Amino acid sequence: MYPKAYIDYLVEFHATRDYFECHEILEEYWKEDPPKKRKRYWVGFIQLAVALYHHRRQNTAGAKRLMANSIRILQAEHRAVEDLGLDHGRLLELMQSVYEQIETVSAYKSIILPIKDEKLEEACRIECRKKKYTWGQPSALSNIFLIDKHRLRDRTDVIREREKEIERRKKSRD
């Protein structure tokens, strides 16, 4: 019914609060489609997670820019958001509220996305239980790896993929 990547995103979003991982999960899924067939709403959800990542790190400028972009994209994707089991109106209200918190440099607070499809939420809760996560748990603000994951993660795979892409481009030019 829903893509596994989307359920994984929601689980990370609401249980571990690992917004960096949310971004990784959905970006990888989004890139599975050919460039001209990629869905904008996935970008909106990716940017929502990254905006919260920056907000939690007190990067106000980055959080504000990404949240504004996310709102703009998801505002235009009413049908897709609803088809993904969320309440579009409540989602936009929530995002606008977070945007205002960012704008006034208020402290980060964990949020719960307005899931209206009970079966979707149950699927997420089941996945949480399998992983021994707690659904709806607030962000662990003392977890430095969670807060600064972009700097502390192992980048070996990322570097290797970039090198492969450079080689592919060189070969395609020859």
Curated annotation (Swiss-Prot):
Disulfide pattern: none
Top-level lineage group: Bacteria
A Pfam family recorded for this sequence: DUF309
Entries under InterPro entries matching the protein: DUF309, TTHA0068_sf
Name the record gives this protein: Uncharacterized protein YpuF
Organism: Bacillus subtilis (strain 168)
Organismal lineage: Bacteria, Bacillati, Bacillota, Bacilli, Bacillales
